[in-house]
């Protein structure tokens, strides 16, 4: 900073600007004078990095910026054994080779209020920013950032250990946030390379000295935030947390060796372990909010609650019958409230029902449980309850539901759910749509099919009034494409109700019709496909994307047809659970056979076509470990499906071919063994269901055939499946 104006007297010191000198104020000398390595007092005033050395003197307020001062003694910016008024200043990058990187207040020192920011100060003894052995009225709306106390080898004669990354005190200390913010962050103790994030260390002056009292007061919407620990002498010290209901004091690091008292204000503790290593806890009033308590007890010499403690989550170790809780050698009279808002199960019980102690009988009736009625371990689901009469939580694994999947964490059910409602359902869609040539060709009357095979044209029938479109090339080879999508919910047997969307597209090529032995005609079809699916159940979202290859052989003889298809593919799955993202791979294959017969009426204007589809599906989900660390081991799924059905087809004069279809679907042998950490999961399957719907196809000129279908499912699958497509013919 450039030149400034200042006043210097016994009542006030204003220090602004830049320089490198020492102002010495002594009760034993009459004059005031400056000392530095090369100059005495001059009239140009005090500059911003001038050092104040008050040896028993009495001065007023200090205002300024103390930047980059160094001192071989304590207090690189201010050393005080006398009296100083209020200090309003920032202390930046000052370094002392003894106590107090910025300020050293000796045992006889008295300082008023301190307001300012302490950033990057360093000391080689106690107190990276402030060392206090005297009296400081209060530190108000001040931030302590990245201050360090460091035990340097060349200064080991000073002391063996160093304390107080930001502040070291042997006397009472008041830290206040009054409609402002005080942050302690990045402060540390570096003791021969052992680094501890520490903000304040409270020490005792001697054998007969009393416990120092550290008071943190937040008021008028003030906030005090500690990212670094508060520690003190093992004999203990007092830590008073006070303020009003508009303000907060937050701890993101530990408090150690303190007798903690809370009054009126709101105190936030990120983890219960941060307040576990202390002498006592007395919540007189106000609210103590604890984000999480681990599964071990917090033991105090004395524990009293007359305010409120809110615990967002408590870890429960069912395998060892323990959970986080407060215990003490002595319990004070408690009339407050401890509210547990949730539990986190970190292990599973050996039994279906487990009781775990949470509260001593002296305060058990002050505890309430306001969390969910159930909780999940990584594998199981438990019903949760609390008994205020004895202080025990109960965890019951049996949910009372007739559905065994209700006893499990949904995150471990991804494999059986995806195998059934994802991969298996996708394979069923393939079987439904792979018989494209038979679906198109067998919608024609027999005389037209014969005409196609023999002459490549339909014969005109004169005035008979029989449907006879011209110049169709369905007997020729052709390409086809058939996209599809379905929107369904699937109430799996022994499993959850799954909302699923399946989508994909098949692209195929049909050969021309060729005669073979025994009066049959044959068509060969090859196809490739993309398939995708998504499932949602019990808060779990799962997605699969994959592809397949397949081939179909279709045989025709008169009004009879038989088609057999074989396909294989793979799919990559991604599941999002309460623990994160899981990835898995699925291999699927299958064979299906569809046969049917046409019963024609009125020269083929109306056709009734009963059919039977039989299929076998193989789905293998490769073993994987999910994001909760549970190993999922799956045996392959082997499934057989039987689908009898009937179609009612109408051939119109203008070339439209509408139809109505109905199918009954049975799934048999469609269960697979899946384990989670060797725990057998429910074997799920799709219940029988009925499909019904309508479709239409239309020949367009001489080159194309367009078709579409909508089918509704009820029973084991509920929803709608939509498909449409086009076939175009090649050749003359």
How does the language model describe each region?
Residues 2-5, 299-405, 414:
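Extracellular, surface-exposed repeat/solenoid domains
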Residues 40-55, 63, 68-80, 95-106, ...:
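Extracellular beta-strand/beta-solenoid scaffold signature
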Residues 217, 237-355:
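Extracellular beta-strand/loop-rich repeat segments of large surface/secreted proteins
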Residues 420-603, 709-711, 716:
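Outer membrane beta-barrel translocator domains of Type V secretion systems
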Residues 475-479, 518-524, 558-564, 604-610, ...:
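Outer-envelope beta-barrel architecture signal
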Residues 493-500, 538-542, 572-585, 620-638, ...:
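Solvent-exposed, glycine/polar-rich loop segments of beta-barrel outer-membrane systems
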Residues 505-511, 549-555, 566-568, 591-599, ...:
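Residues on the lipid-exposed face of transmembrane beta-strands in outer-membrane beta-barrel proteins
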Residues 631-732:
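Outer membrane beta-barrel transmembrane domains
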């Amino acid at each position: 900073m450039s030149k400034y104006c200042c006043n210097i007297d016994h009542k006030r010191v204003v220090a602004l600007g830049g320089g490198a000198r020492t102002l010495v104020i002594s009760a034993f000398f009459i004059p005031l004078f400056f000392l530095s390595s090369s100059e005495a007092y001059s009239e140009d005033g005090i500059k911003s990095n001038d050092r104040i050395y008050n040896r028993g003197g009495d001065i007023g307020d200090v205002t300024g910026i103390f930047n980059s001062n160094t001192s071989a003694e304590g207090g690189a910016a201010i050393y005080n054994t006398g009296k100083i008024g209020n200090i309003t200043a920032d202390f930046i990058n000052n370094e002392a080779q003894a106590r107090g990187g910025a300020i050293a207040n000796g045992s006889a020192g008295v300082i008023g209020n301190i307001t300012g920011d302490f950033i990057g100060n360093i000391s080689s003894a106690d107190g990276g920013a402030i060392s206090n052995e005297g009296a400081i009225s209060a530190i108000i709306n001040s931030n302590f950032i990245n201050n360090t106390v460091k035990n340097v080898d060349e200064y080991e004669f000073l002391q063996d250990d160093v304390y107080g990354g930001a502040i070291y005190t042997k006397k009472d200390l008041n830290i206040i946030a009054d409609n402002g913010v005080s942050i302690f962050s990045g402060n540390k103790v570096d003791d021969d390379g052992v680094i501890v994030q520490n903000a304040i260390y409270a020490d005792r002056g001697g054998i007969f000295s009393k416990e120092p009292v550290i008071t943190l007061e937040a008021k008028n919407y003030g906030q005090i935030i500690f990212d670094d620990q508060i520690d003190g002498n093992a004999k203990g010290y007092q830590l008073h947390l006070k303020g009003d209901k508009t303000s907060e004091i937050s701890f993101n690091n530990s408090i150690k060796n303190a007798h903690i008292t809370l009054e009126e204000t709101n105190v936030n503790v990120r983890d219960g372990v941060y307040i576990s290593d202390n002498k006592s806890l007395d919540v007189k009033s106000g609210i103590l909010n604890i984000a999480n308590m681990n599964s071990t007890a917090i033991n105090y010499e004395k524990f009293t609650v007359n305010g409120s403690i809110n615990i967002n989550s408590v870890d429960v170790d069912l395998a060892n019958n323990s959970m986080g809780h407060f215990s003490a050698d002595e319990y004070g009279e408690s009339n407050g409230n401890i509210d547990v808002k949730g539990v986190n199960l970190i292990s599973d019980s050996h039994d279906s029902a487990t009781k775990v102690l949470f509260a001593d009988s002296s305060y058990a009736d002050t505890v309430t449980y306001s969390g969910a009625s159930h909780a999940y371990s990584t594998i199981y689901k438990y019903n949760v309850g609390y008994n205020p009469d004895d202080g025990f939580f109960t965890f019951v694994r049996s949910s009372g539901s007739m559905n065994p999947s209700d006893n499990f964490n949904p995150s471990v059910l991804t494999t059986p759910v995806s195998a059934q409602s994802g991969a298996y359902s996708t394979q069923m869609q393939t079987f439904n749509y792979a018989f494209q040539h038979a679906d198109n060709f067998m919608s024609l009357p027999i005389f037209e099919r014969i005409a196609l095979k023999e002459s490549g044209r339909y014969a005109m029938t004169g005035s008979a009034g029989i449907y006879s479109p011209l110049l169709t090339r369905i007997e020729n080879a052709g390409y086809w494409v058939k996209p599809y999508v379905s929107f369904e919910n699937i109430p799996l047997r022994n499993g959850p109700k799954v909302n699923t969307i399946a989508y994909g597209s098949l692209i195929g090529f049909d050969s021309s019709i060729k005669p073979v032995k025994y009066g049959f005609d044959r068509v060969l079809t090859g196809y490739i496909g993309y398939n995708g699916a998504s499932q949602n159940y019990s808060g779990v979202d799962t997605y699969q994307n994959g592809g397949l290859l397949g081939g179909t052989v279709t045989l025709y003889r008169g009004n009879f047809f038989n088609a057999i298809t074989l396909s294989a593919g793979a799919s990559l799955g991604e599941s999002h659970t309460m623990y994160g993202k899981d990835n898995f791979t699925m291999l699927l294959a299958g064979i299906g056979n569809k046969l049917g017969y046409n019963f024609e009426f009125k020269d083929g204007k109306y056709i009734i076509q009963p059919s039977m589809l039989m299929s076998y599906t193989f789905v293998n989900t490769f073993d994987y470990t999910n994001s909760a660390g549970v190993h999922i081991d799956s045996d392959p799924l082997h499934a057989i499906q039987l689908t009898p059905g009937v179609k009612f087809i109408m051939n119109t004069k203008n070339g439209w071919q509408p139809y109505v279809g109905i199918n009954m679907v049975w799934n048999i042998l469609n269960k697979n063994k899946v384990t989670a950490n060797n725990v057998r999961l429910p074997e799920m399957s799709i219940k029988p269901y009925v499909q019904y719907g309508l479709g239409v196809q239309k020949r367009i000129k001489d080159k194309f055939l367009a078709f579409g279908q909508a089918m509704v499912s009820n029973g084991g699958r509920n929803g709608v499946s939509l498909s449409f497509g086009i076939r175009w013919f090649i050749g003359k």
